[in-house]
A protein has these predicted regions:
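Catalytic subdomain that performs nucleotidyl-dependent activation
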Residues: 92-174
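ATP-dependent adenylation/nucleotidyltransferase module used to activate substrates
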Residues: 1-100, 104-108, 112, 135-143, ...
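A short glycine-/small-residue-rich loop at the edge of a beta-strand within enzyme catalytic domains
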Residues: 64, 86, 128, 132, ...
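Short, solvent-exposed coil/turn elements at secondary-structure transition points
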Residues: 21-23, 49-51, 117, 131, ...
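The feature marks non-catalytic terminal segments
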Residues: 146-220
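Mobile, glycine- and charge-enriched loop segments
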Residues: 40-60, 123, 199-215
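Short, basic, helix/turn surface patches
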Residues: 68-80, 114-120, 173-192
Length: 220
């Protein structure tokens, strides 16, 4: 994706291909290296011991793991002279996140296409596959003979991530069911994040400040 943009020439940029080994089993590490070789990518792999660090965390170890991984990626990217990190979240991830927030979090929020780091000044996180559907990525993977890893964490079977993954899969099945009667259901969910009418909300939060409906109503 980013190589295509670079070849297009309208966006001037340089690329570094970075992957972290947080404590993978040798077979999983080899799979990443094989994928990079198939695509002829000059992949820079750096090692951490994140899996070992979160092994004893009983409550929400996946949240801690994700935070630590993000921090290590920012630090390593800065060493390479980068100011942005591109992650692989796609269209389906966005709509599943919206639905998980509604059904399991009691909140309405989406996954933004880019973020400025609050802990690493000058660094941004971008999601270039934001509009790309998962089925298209799967076809691309199969066309190129690649094999993808999921979490690959040795502790997944005993932690809350297993429940989270089942919830995400539940949302995936729900969307598939909805598309049987409304083929554009996924697009409508995605577009809902573009069409938020805050005046109709009972309460909303922006930049850490909450705005209850009654307070806004009395101001009118």
């Amino acid at each position: 994706c980013l190589e295509e943009l670079q070849r297009d020439g309208r966006v001037k940029s340089s690329l570094e291909f970075l992957a972290m080994d947080p404590g993978y089993a040798p077979a999983n590490r080899a799979l990443i290296e094989e994928n990079a070789a198939l695509l002829e990518l000059p992949l820079h792999i750096f090692e951490t011991q994140i899996f070992g660090a979160v092994a004893s965390v009983e409550k929400n170890p996946c949240y801690l793991c994700a935070r630590m991984r993000r921090g290590y990626l920012y630090e390593e990217a800065k060493k390479l002279g980068c100011n942005k990190i591109a992650l692989g979240h796609h269209f389906d991830d966005v709509i599943e996140t919206i639905l998980m927030g509604i059904f399991y979090g009691g909140q309405m929020q989406s996954m933004p296409p880019k973020l400025k780091s609050t802990s690493h000044p000058g660094m941004q996180l971008i999601r270039p596959l934001y509009y790309v559907h998962e089925e298209d990525i799967v076809r691309w993977k199969e066309h190129n003979g690649l094999s993808f890893l999921r979490c690959a964490c040795r502790f997944t079977e005993n932690c809350a991530r297993h429940e989270e993954e089942s919830k995400r899969y539940e949302m995936k099945k729900l969307v598939a069911q909805m598309k049987k009667t409304n083929p554009n259901a996924d697009i409508s969910i995605f577009r809902s994040a573009y069409n938020v009418h805050v005046d109709t909300l009972i309460e909303y939060d922006t930049k850490g400040k909450r705005y209850p409906f009654l307070e806004r109503y009395d101001e009118k």
